[in-house]
């Protein structure tokens, strides 16, 4: 799940 950046699998 992305936290605000691009689209990471975690964070």
UniProtKB/Swiss-Prot annotation:
Any GO CC annotation of this UniProt entry: extracellular region
Residues that bear Asparagine amide: 11
GO BP annotations listed: neuropeptide signaling pathway
Lineage: superkingdom: Eukaryota
One Pfam family recorded for the sequence: Periviscerokin
Purpose of the protein: Mediates visceral muscle contractile activity (myotropic activity).
InterPro entries: Periviscerokinin
Name the record gives this protein: Periviscerokinin-1
Listed transmembrane segments: none
Keyword Secreted attributed: yes
